[in-house]
């Protein structure tokens, strides 16, 4: 999260193989809501416009859904959730000025591509790009470590800790209700 600086386009794919358990819950509330919560915590702006579509393939509610959320600060998020995929995927990509950040939540991998002003005397192996105006940028690649932990266990432990120590939880009631409000707006589009 420290690497994110006003992303302007966010793309998420949360795809799951079919499991008959859970088809009574809309895919937006079962899967997409996690990405809605992440995006709202990163963007920190109000929803300006939302459009969505969903298709019921196996169950009575949409099994696959896509939503496009436009925020007041200009950021656009495109979210896809499916419970009828052939393989599992949990990826989010952030695009911001001079950086691209890809997070694979399933494989616990992160890829960061950043551009910075090029040095006066670049090395032989430095990757330098030059735009139409002649501005030179150097490309840097990074693969920061992602802790291999149990997200649900961590969430429950921090919640219990907030109760025990009378502190503010990491994810507040407001955060949860806002994610649910946006999820409901998406479902209302179907």
Where are these predicted regions, by residue range?
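Conserved catalytic core of Hanks-type protein kinase domains
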Residues: 3, 42, 162
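A general structural motif
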Residues: 5-7, 47, 166
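Mobile beta-alpha loop/short-helix "lid" or hinge segments that flank ligand
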Residues: 6-7, 11-17, 130
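Rossmann-like dinucleotide-binding domain that binds NAD(P)(H)
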Residues: 13, 18-87, 91-95, 105-107, ...
């Amino acid at each position: 999260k420290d690497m994110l600086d006003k992303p302007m386009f966010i793309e998420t794919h949360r795809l799951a193989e079919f499991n008959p358990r859970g088809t009574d819950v809309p895919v937006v509330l079962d899967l997409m809501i996690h990405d809605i919560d992440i995006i709202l915590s990163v963007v920190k702006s109000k929803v300006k416009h939302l459009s969505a579509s969903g298709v019921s393939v196996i169950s009575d509610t949409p099994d696959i859904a896509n939503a496009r959320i436009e925020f007041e600060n200009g950021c656009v998020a495109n979210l896809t959730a499916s419970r009828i995929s052939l393989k599992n995927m949990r990826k989010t990509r952030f695009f911001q000025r001079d950086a691209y950040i890809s997070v694979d939540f399933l494989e616990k991998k992160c890829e960061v591509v950043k551009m910075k002003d090029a040095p006066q005397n670049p090395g032989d192996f430095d990757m330098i790009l030059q735009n139409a105006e002649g501005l030179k940028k150097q490309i840097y690649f990074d693969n920061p470590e992602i802790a291999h932990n149990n997200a649900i266990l961590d969430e429950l432990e921090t919640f219990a800790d907030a109760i025990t120590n009378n502190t503010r939880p990491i994810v507040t009631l407001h955060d949860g209700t806002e994610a649910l409000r946006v999820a409901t707006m998406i479902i209302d589009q179907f």
